[in-house]
Structure formats: C-alpha cells, structure tokens
Regions:
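Non-heme di-metal
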Residues: 1-195
C-alpha cells in the first residue's frame, strides 16, 4: 500500500529562479508557512478531539513544524533578515482549502487530511529544489534535512485518513485533489514564496 503523494506537476524553473533572486523574502515566507503548518496540525486536534487515534501524531507534527519555524527564524537572524510585520495572503492555500468546503463533516475531515499531505509534499519538492540549487552551503544543508522531514509529514496525513476511510475512497479523492493542486500551482503568479 502506498502512503506517499505523487504530485501531478513539478515546480517550474521560473519559480526557482524567482526564489533564488530574492531569497530573503523566501525565508520570510517560509517562516510564516512553518508557523501556519504548526497551527494547522493543532487545529485538527481542536476540531476533531474525538479522533483520538491521530492526536499524538498531530501534536508531534505541530511541535516539529514549530521547531522548523524556530530554525528558519534563527537562520534569518544570522543573516540579518527580520520577520515581516505583515505576510501576503497565500492564494495557493486559499484555493486548495476552497476544495474542502461542502460535503459532510466526515468528507471535509478526509479532504483536509489529504490536502495537508499534498501541501507537505509540495513543500518537500520545493525544499529539495532549493537545497540542490542554492550556493550557500549552510542553506543547502538546512533545506536538504528539511525536505526529508516534510516528506514524512506528507505520508502521515495519508496514513491518518486511512484510519477512518476505505482505501479506494482515500486514493480516489487524493488523485482528484492532486490534479486540482497541479492546476492551481501552474496558474499561480511567480513570487519568492513557498507557494
């Protein structure tokens, strides 16, 4: 049985070039994404306290994402890059989350888990690209370690969904959402941001 998510499209070279041209802004956005990822994991705990089988893993994920935020923040401090006072809206996340509206509470729960997997896998793919192309050795090492961690996160959300839903239902819906994510990511305006 597969747990990993295979994205339907790769990130473009134009996206990578945009990030490399303004890496300070990318770091600022990355820090905010890690903070939001931690909050998202805890929001599952708050919204679904009856799903006890996944709560320990959600808490562990939230802590790990918060540690990633701290690591990015420390990198920014060493490089003299401040946390921004205001972050841009994440159109990617807004469009993805719009796909989870409607349906029953159970299908929304399923879709939110699957969407979390897709988002983590997109982050993994992009962190890997950064690690392979950035010239700064410290940043290259950091992003190499980070993409391996994000790959694990992508897998755990699929595993969580499989605790509550049939394999066919999970993978059919996952395939639908992966295709929609590819459409969204391909249409995004280029900016030095994770999404």
């Amino acid at each position: 049985m597969k747990y990993s998510v295979e994205l339907a499209c790769d990130s473009s070279k134009a996206w990578l070039d945009t990030v490399m041209d303004d890496f300070g802004s990318f770091l600022q956005d990355h820090a905010d994404c890690e903070r939001k990822a931690s909050a998202m994991a805890m929001s599952f705990v708050a919204k679904y306290p009856n799903r006890k089988e996944i709560i320990p893993e959600l808490i562990e994920t939230a802590i790990e994402e918060l540690e990633h935020f701290q690591q990015v923040y420390n990198l920014m401090e060493r490089k003299g890059i401040a946390l921004p006072s205001e972050m841009q809206k994440d159109v990617y996340m807004q469009q993805l989350m719009a796909l989870t509206h409607g349906g029953t509470p159970d299908t929304r729960f399923r879709d939110r888990l699957l969407m979390a997997s897709i988002v983590e896998c997109r982050g993994c793919e992009r962190f890997k690209l950064v690690s392979e192309h950035i010239e700064d050795e410290e940043l290259s090492r950091f992003y190499k370690v980070l993409w391996a961690s994000e790959a694990k996160h992508g897998n755990i959300f699929v595993k969580m969904a499989l605790k509550y839903f049939e394999n066919k239902e999970v993978y059919d819906r996952l395939d639908e959402l992966i295709q929609k994510e590819a459409e969204i990511v391909s249409a995004l305006p280029l900016r030095p941001a994770l999404h």
